[in-house]
C-alpha cells in the first residue's frame, strides 16, 4: 500500500526493490502457515524448497545487476574514448543496452568523468544534465521546449529540451554511437524513440579541443581491451575533427587486427575516409561485409553521393553501395 500511495509499482520481472517492504510480512507469515502442517517431514521439504527459491532469486538478482554494471561501465569507457569533454549545460539522452529508470543513470556517470565538482558552492548542481528517453521527453523535444528545473534529494538540475546530445547503444553487441544532426546515421537495430529525435541531437556540444578524460577506477573499473569499439570511437572522433588521414590509419589497423563490426553502420567513418583517400579496394572489402544490412547500405549510399569527391570515386561508390 505505501508503494502504491506514492505512485510506484512493483515489477517482478526486474526484481523490483519495492517488494522489500512486503517481503518482511511474508517472511513472518509463511513459517506460521507451515507450522499448521502436522507432518514434520513435509515441513522440512517445504522450508527447503522456500530456501532454495530464495537462494536462486538472490543469485539471479546479483547476476543481473553484475551484468548491468559491467555493461554500464563499458558504455561509459566507450564514451570517454569518443568524447574528450562535454560543455557545461549539455543535456544527454542515452539509450543503454540495459534499462535506465532515472535521469541520474546518465548524468551521474557523465559528471563523474567530465565535471566531478558541483557548479554551485551552496548546493549540488551537476554541470551535465540528462533526460529519460520516453514519450514525455520526445513530445517536449518536438515542441522545442526550453530549460526545465528539477530538484531531487537537494540536487538541482536544469535539463534543456533544445540542447540535447544522444548517446545510443542499439543492442549489447553494438558500440556506443553519438548521433549528430548534421549527418544522422542510424543502426538497423536502433530504438524507434531514438529515430524520432535523432535529427535534434547536437554533437557540437562535444568540446573537441580538450584533453581526453579517464574514468575513475571506482565506479568504472579497469579500462576494457581495445577491440573494435575502441577503434570505432577513435575513428568517429577523428572524423568529427576532420582528420581523415587518421581515420584511414585506424581503419588499416582494424583490417590488420581482423576486427569486425557487429553493427554495420559503424563502418561509416572508415567508408568516408577511404572514399576521400580513393582507396577502392578497402571500400570493396567493407561493401562485401555490409551487404546484408540493407539500411546501413542505403545510408552509406546517400552519404557517399553527397560527399565532395572525384567523380570516378563517386561512380565506384555508387556501384558498390547504391544497389537498386
Functional labels for PLM-detected ranges:
Residues 24-27, 79-85, 90-92:
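Conserved beta-strand->loop/alpha-helix structural units within folded catalytic cores of enzymes
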Residues 28-58:
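Signature aromatic-anchored transmembrane alpha helix within multi-pass, membrane-resident enzymes
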Residues 37-43, 74-76, 93-107:
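Juxtamembrane/interfacial segments around transmembrane helices
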Residues 52-81:
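Hydrophobic alpha-helical transmembrane segments in integral membrane proteins
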Residues 83-88, 96-324:
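C-terminal luminal/periplasmic domains and tails of membrane-associated envelope-modifying transferases
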Amino acid at each position: 500500500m505505501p508503494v502504491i500511495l506514492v505512485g510506484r509499482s512493483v515489477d517482478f520481472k526486474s526484481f523490483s526493490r519495492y517488494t522489500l517492504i512486503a517481503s518482511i510480512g511474508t517472511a513472518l507469515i509463511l513459517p506460521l502457515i507451515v507450522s499448521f502442517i502436522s507432518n514434520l517431514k513435509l515441513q522440512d521439504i517445504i522450508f527447503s524448497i522456500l530456501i532454495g527459491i530464495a537462494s536462486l532469486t538472490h543469485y539471479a538478482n546479483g547476476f543481473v545487476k553484475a551484468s548491468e554494471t559491467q555493461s554500464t561501465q563499458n558504455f561509459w569507457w566507450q564514451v570517454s574514448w569518443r568524447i574528450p569533454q562535454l560543455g557545461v549545460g549539455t543535456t544527454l539522452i542515452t539509450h543503454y543496452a540495459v534499462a535506465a529508470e532515472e535521469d541520474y543513470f546518465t548524468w551521474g556517470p557523465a559528471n563523474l568523468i567530465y565535471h566531478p565538482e558541483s557548479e554551485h558552492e551552496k548546493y549540488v548542481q551537476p554541470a551535465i544534465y540528462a533526460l529519460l528517453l520516453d514519450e514525455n521527453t520526445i513530445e517536449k523535444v518536438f515542441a522545442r521546449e526550453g530549460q526545465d528545473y528539477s530538484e531531487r534529494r537537494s540536487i538541482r538540475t536544469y535539463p534543456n529540451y533544445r540542447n540535447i546530445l544522444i548517446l545510443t547503444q542499439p543492442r549489447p553487441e553494438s558500440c556506443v554511437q553519438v548521433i549528430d544532426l548534421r549527418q544522422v546515421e542510424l543502426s538497423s537495430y536502433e530504438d524507434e524513440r531514438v529515430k524520432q529525435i535523432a535529427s535534434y541531437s547536437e554533437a557540437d556540444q562535444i568540446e573537441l579541443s580538450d584533453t581526453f578524460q579517464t574514468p575513475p577506477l571506482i565506479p568504472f573499473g579497469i579500462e576494457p581491451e581495445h577491440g573494435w569499439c575502441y577503434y570505432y570511437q577513435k575513428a568517429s572522433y577523428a572524423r568529427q575533427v576532420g582528420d581523415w588521414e587518421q581515420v584511414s590509419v585506424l581503419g588499416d589497423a582494424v583490417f590488420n587486427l581482423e576486427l569486425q563490426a557487429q553493427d554495420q553502420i559503424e563502418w561509416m567513418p572508415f567508408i568516408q575516409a577511404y572514399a576521400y583517400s580513393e582507396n577502392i579496394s578497402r571500400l570493396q572489402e567493407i561493401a562485401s561485409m555490409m551487404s546484408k544490412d540493407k539500411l546501413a547500405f542505403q545510408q552509406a549510399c546517400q552519404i557517399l553521393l553527397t560527399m565532395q569527391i572525384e567523380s570516378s570515386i563517386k561512380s565506384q561508390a555508387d556501384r558498390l553501395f547504391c544497389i537498386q
